[in-house]
């Protein structure tokens, strides 16, 4: 149920989809491949450094990378890009849809949780096209996925609370791993 000041709009109007990021062809940038995205982790760092050849996805620190291919999307491969050097740009697999908060509409942290929300993910999965085993979500499908978003201050509060919970989950995961290694 939407509260006061909540707005319903198509996902591609609530967030920026595949926003423009300038990279110089031939220059070396951080690269993220699909294998690096862990469905259990909120963020993903670069897999390696690679020269930019002109194709694939492009993103900056804090952007959300959502798998667009089967079975990766069904497995929950959605994460925020964590640049190792500040706001540095990176590039990655052609099988990512890049999501960023839209200025004055959505907070970037909230955009991640909105993308990760099961309602959006299930909708995207239902819109996959292509041959069996190689199905993809067309970017155009995001214009038909309606989402309800709160005001920016509420978005920031929601993203902060969920981020704090994710931090605690990650800390518990690391503690469990340490205990298992002992």
Set out the residue ranges of the language-model regions.
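Active-site donor-binding loop signature of nucleotide-sugar glycosyltransferases
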Residues: 34, 101, 147
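Non-catalytic DNA-recognition/assembly elements of restriction-modification systems
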Residues: 1-22, 148, 152-159, 163-182
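Residues that recognize and position ribonucleotide moieties
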Residues: 4, 30, 89-90, 113, ...
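A short beta-sheet element
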Residues: 55-57, 61-117
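Sequence-specific dsDNA recognition surfaces
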Residues: 8-67, 72-74, 80-81
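Short, positively charged
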Residues: 109-139
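A short glycine-rich beta-alpha junction/loop motif
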Residues: 89-97, 129-159
């Amino acid at each position: 149920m939407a509260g006061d000041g909540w707005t319903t709009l198509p996902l591609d109007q609530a967030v920026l989809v595949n926003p423009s990021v300038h990279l110089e062809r031939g220059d070396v940038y951080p690269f993220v491949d699909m294998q690096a995205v862990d469905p259990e982790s909120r963020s993903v760092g670069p897999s390696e450094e690679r020269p930019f050849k002109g194709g694939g996805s492009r993103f900056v620190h804090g952007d959300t990378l959502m798998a667009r291919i089967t079975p990766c999307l069904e497995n929950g491969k959605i994460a925020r890009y964590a640049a190792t050097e500040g706001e540095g740009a990176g590039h990655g697999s052609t099988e990512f849809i890049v999501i960023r908060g839209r200025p004055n509409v959505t907070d970037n942290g909230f955009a991640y949780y909105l993308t990760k929300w099961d309602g959006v993910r299930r909708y995207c999965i239902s819109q996959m096209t292509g041959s069996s085993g190689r199905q993809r979500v067309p970017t155009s499908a995001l214009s038909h996925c309606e989402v309800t978003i709160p005001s920016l201050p509420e978005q920031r509060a929601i993203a902060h609370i969920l981020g704090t919970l994710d931090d605690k989950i990650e800390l518990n995961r690391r503690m469990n791993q340490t205990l298992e290694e002992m």
